[in-house]
Amino acid sequence: AKRMSEVTGEEAKTIHRLLQVDWDEKDNPVFTRNERNPLECDCLVVDELSMVDAYVFESLLRALPFSCRLVLVGDNDQLPSVGAGNVLGDLIASGLFPTVQLKEIFRQSQESLIVMSAHRIVEGKLPDLRRHDSDFFFLPQEDPQKAAQLIVSLCSVRLPRSYGYSSVTDIQVLCPGRKGELGTVELNKHLREAINPPARGKAEAKVNGALFRLGDKVMQIRNDYNLPWAKEDGTAGEGVFNGDMGVITEIDKPGGAIHVRIDDKDVVYDFERASNELEPAYAVTVHKSQGNEFPAVVIPVLDPPRQLCYRNLLYTGVTRAKQLLILVGRRGVIDAMVENNRKTKRYTGLKWFLLNEE
């Protein structure tokens, strides 16, 4: 929603917010916009449809008036929704709806090796890992500890020195998973100590085992529709969303509050809320990055869990990079990810119901 507002200049909302989500006693979503209380719109555009599960999509359809035009936008080669279903893929595969494939690239130039590599990955072909004269690099490394050290060096020293990137706002490490030496948990510890080390006078707070330090890069890990924010121009509102990233600008220990700058908004968390909703974001999972884009992306590809070693995950990570992409690890892992088109094994019934509806 944030990115769409930036690009279009129009208000954009998450589907949950559009449908005015509430929560039942079991913390399940309940949408107050539905067939009895429909939306008031003539045309609705839904972006990133590959991330929308079957339940949310059904709820959206129930809330639309029959006169509304629905335009669906998404990349069927990216990661499927976390929840059940393969909505975008099934709608396309049914052949019942007018479909247009967009081929012109706006994030990079057509000559970009990032673009060429993304196309090859989608086609099940290995990207060119030998070139070192473009925006896509592969740095071979067999040892997880040395790979972690290399990633930390890239993010804290080499890329800022060579390209002028900010270690906090421009460079993003994307990991297949959270666990292991090259998962987000361990890498965040190493990256934080290199990029934002402790110092005399630099405020810190430890809450429920979570460490927060002034200057830390953090990510909102769940939607919070009631969290207030304010801008310098006096504009105020509510709502911070899953995947939003920011930097800690103040830690008020006496007041038990943490201030985070998310884009041009100042968001104040009490300590309890921060420990439940914020995580370090020097490294995040590819899943959490979906829908975002970054000037420079570094991806470890050395020892991901087998269940995360598949094509759509690699493709999604690669396509988050706008200007520079670096893969660190083993060529064999990249081969395995490109060859494994596991997404085809997600079993759903939407296509069948569409084609057999009486």
Where are these regions (language model features)?
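Conserved helicase motor core of SF1/SF2 NTP-dependent helicases
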Residues: 2-7, 15-30, 35-142, 216, ...
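Conserved helicase motor core of P-loop NTPases
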Residues: 76-239, 249
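Conserved two-lobed SF2 helicase motor
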Residues: 12-17, 279-282
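Short beta-strands and strand-coil junctions in structured, solvent-facing domains, enriched
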Residues: 52, 79, 226-227, 304-307
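Structural motif
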Residues: 43-47, 174, 219, 298-300, ...
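Conserved helicase NTPase catalytic core signature
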Residues: 1-9, 180, 273-275
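C-terminal accessory regions
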Residues: 123, 231-235, 242-358
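Residue-level recognition of short, solvent-exposed, well-ordered loop/turn junctions
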Residues: 65, 213-214, 241, 289
